[in-house]
Amino acid sequence: MAKLPEKGQTLWGFTVTERNSISMLGAETAELFHPFSGARLLYIHNDDRELGFNLIYRTPQLDNLDSNHILEHLMLCSCPSYPSRDVFFDMDSKSYSTFMNGITDNTCTCYPVCSLSMEQLIKLMDVFLCCMEEPEALKDHRFFMREGLRFELEDTDGELSMLGTVLSEDWGHLTDLEENADSAAAQALYEGQIAANLLGRAHFHYKEITFEKIRQTYEQLYDYSNCLMILYGDADLEAVLRFLDEKHLSRFKSRNLNLRPLFEGPVSSGFRKTEVKSPAYEGSPAEHSSVIDYTIDLSGLSQEDVICMGFCAGMMDQDTSPVQRAARSLGLNNIIDVYLDTALARPVLKFRLQNGDKEQQELFFQAVNQGLADMAENGIADELYHAVIKENRLADLLMRETPHLGFHLSEDIGRFWSLTGRTDYYSLYERTFTHFSADQEQSILRRLAKQVLNPPSAVLSAAIPVPGLAEALEQERDRWLREKKASMSPKELQALIRETEDFKKWSAQDKSCLDFLIQPEQLPEPEEDPPFFSGLRHGIFCCGSPSPLAGIGSYQLFFDLSELSGEDWNYLTLYQMLLTELDTRRFCVEQQKIMEQEYLYDCTFDELYPDADAGENSRPMMSVVWSGLTEDFEISLDFLLELMRNGNYEYRETISQVIEKYLPDYDLSKSENGPSLAYSLAERYIRQDSRFRFQLNSPEIYHFLKNILTILIREQSHPDDEAARTDANQISSSLYTLAQKLVSRRKLIFLAAAENASLEHILDRASTLLSQLPERNENGFMFSNHLSLPSWDQAPSLRTAACIDSSLEELRMLGDFKKVPEFKGRFLPWLLAAGDKYVKPAVRYQGRAYDSGIDFLLPAGYFTLWSTEDPDIESTLSVFNRTGQALAELKLTPEDLQGYILSAYAQALPPIGILNSRMRAMRRYIMGISTVYINEMIRNIRNSTVNDQKEASDLICRLLKSGPVSVVGNEKIILEYKNRFDEILKIKEKNGTV
């Protein structure tokens, strides 16, 4: 790595103002100031090959119209240097970028891009900067009509409609309970201040949105003197500085914008209470569904104390903290989240009670204050304090495993800078963490607990879902549109009809820009798998891969599920839910909660059923993944096995409390589950593994858990009822039996990635401990290979819809090329061309979806046509069905294809961390996934030529003709097109199907 310039040194119009370091990233930093333009640049320099650049503007929410969000969409549409219909999507679909986005926050707007190529990064930076300087969208009203808001009228007798990408996105959040809760708290806490305005509220203020207001927002906010640029990775700093100065910054004299005072000013003191009605659709639950927040303003704290409050919040969020204990002692069996929220214009400490009722507000408030008083007086248990400190340290050590790290870091720094004017967030974080973790007396924690126990300003708020209110707001919108049309003169109506026609013609134009391309010959070779070894140790199949990272490792276990039968499968969800919730033979619940934090970092359970390519591993399995310090490995594995084997399932009152607490999380009818459910419904048709996972996590699990809860409550309510006790005993017995069947050494697999000095010891201790597990259960029943999952032999429907509590739809159509040998890597760029040139224009620009496109998953062997937050089913599915034919008709130049080659290569070869790459290689080996085949496909991407068009279109036609379709969303829209589907699931109804 090249040496950074020293403080005071001047390069290309920039002067180095600060030098620092971030040890967790292995990075040195330099902050540079460009006096002429007023711009600042922070360079975070380490050996990361994935480079990142982020252009960040300080953007206070000056109103409730979501103006900054609309402006963010407009900024990267077009500019004189890069004229296009939408140059952002040109770059996204035709460049070697590994990440790209535009993101609006409550205090800043950022435009990040990442790439593995320095040349590509600078070319994309040029597009971003040119668009910021001369956005074409602020001159041509039609961009605003597309991205923000427009009115359409086909003829004088037709209905007036209101459309727009951001409006559609915001309207899709109509029933977002937590978003509505955040808004209610901010409005009450910061009434009359900018901090009260949150993003994403256009659907409540659409009558006030105008193009002129958006243009005014640009003039108020966008200047280089109100901008921070962040460069990350092993970049060529001098080349970047020269480019910035010569091509951009030297052309724009600073306007000396100073918007930070807009975030400042006194906060009204005192305690307030408020309630807000949150829209919900008819049939949505009203009981046990509210969000109750206690929000404390932290404006008076120093930056160091705000960071420390984040550590304290992490401790209070734990199940064994004084706040959580106080809540349980007062009879509150709800999930209570505690977190520091720095995404607002002012930092706040948030206590959030989930799945509550408004009558719980006072009890919740009492619990929080009781817990805070305990902490202020006594601190927290030393074991919990040190476990949370260790968990934070592990997170810091593993930060480099995060893909697109340059973006994630810069987002945090951007928020910090927008409020403070400082860029040293991570350096300050490290110093503060060192100070906090060394505070053995917990004096900082006790002091902060005392401060928030009697805060200068706080609000207790409740967001209460009101079924039917969503429909009422939609009806109000439709009534307003009818009245608006009725108020228009014949001349105005004709003008709107012409404007609608003109907009549709303009939107249908294929105008793109390719002036940012690099040559495909410059693309790197795909990397081979990192080395690993495998074999039997003490009868356990083990794989190990040496890592250069000292002191930290990643681990994975695969338990065989072949013996499970009948209701075992439903109980698997309950079994996983109860881990760390019941005493075991060696550890009480409180000990488990603390040890989980300390020894099982990011521990996740999952189910899988690899296909025939996995050979003898083509069988149902349960995976357990975790990370930790290598010195703690043996303790972590021993603890994990104790959790899994020895839960006391006689504690049925506790089991009922746990189910009651977490049951709402299994309700798939919530709108936020739409995207994942849409993928699951489609994937289950083409993949055994996906079908297996869907059946184990289907909507019916929610009803199974409700039934278990009913049985347990009946036993508690009728202790003398023998039948009730028998039914409840059966639940305990089923859980014991399941644990015996699950935790066996039969066909057990263990993977480890760790430093070479520790790896042999880890594999030896793992195989020794695991070999002591039984191979048959305690009843002596031999395990078998038979799979008896209910409905397993019933083929999934080809075309499935699911009705959930949502205003819009998620649509997916899949093409399966895994077993199609004639499908080569060179066809992948053509897939992306079809998405960019046909699907996105038809569904997003000319349709009404928030976004749409085509993606592929190379290791999984399929591609997806998708649209999100889409009010149209019929037209979108028609577009999807015609994709192959449309591709055959596209007119692509070699330069167009070059861009799609770059994008396909970036999508096929995403960056991956050191530990993750080793774990992935071993997992692929276990699953029978060939890295050689994947790399051959990736290399073949570069061989794509215009001569491949017909073969690609024919293959895509064929694959889509037999591919599955799923639609998840609004029931009314789905039922309008019910003939399109073989099966319609009504998630909120127990019977499940209509």
Where are these regions (language model features)?
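Non-catalytic terminal extensions that flank enzyme cores
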Residues: A2-G52
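C-terminal regions of mature proteins
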Residues: A2-P5, I230-G233, V388-R537, F541-P546, ...
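His/Glu-based metal-binding/catalytic segments typifying zinc-dependent metallopeptidases
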Residues: I44-I56, L167-W171, L257-P322, G406-R422, ...
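Active-site His/Glu-centered metal-binding helix of metallohydrolases
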Residues: L71-M75, Y575
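Non-catalytic accessory/assembly modules
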Residues: S78-P80, E133-E136, D140-L167, W171-L174, ...
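Acidic/histidine-enriched segments that form metal/cofactor-coordinating
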Residues: C79-P80, V87-T217, I307-G310, D317, ...
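Catalytic or ion-translocation cores adjacent to nucleophile or general acid/base/metal-coordination motifs
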Residues: P80-S84, K94-Y96, S254-G265, Q556-F558, ...
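A structural supersecondary motif
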Residues: S95-F99, D293-T295, M315-N355, Q597-P610, ...
